[in-house]
């Protein structure tokens, strides 16, 4: 069982991420959002950052660095972004994305599991 401080850090970080996503939605048409890494697997510490996959077709024709530039201006420091189009996410051509998808949890589902509205 997770320590209370780790669970509280997960809830607080999820609330912060939802606020960040709502701000990003003002500029980018987001199709879906996934949490990956330790926060998705459940092996996080209370100091762990949150790895977030943003799916948007607004990323088409943008170099990867340009995608991240669009996202990082919204970052609160403890969020790591990954940015893919729907096609890249649905039909991955790299092991990196394939492995990411194995552990991915939809942000909306993860938030609900902590009784957080999204």
List each model region and its residues.
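Short beta-strand->loop micro-motif that forms the acidic, two-metal-ion catalytic signature
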Residues: 51-54
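Catalytic core of pol beta-like nucleotidyltransferases
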Residues: 1-31, 41-46, 56-118
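Short gly/ser/thr-rich secondary-structure transition/capping motifs
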Residues: 33-37
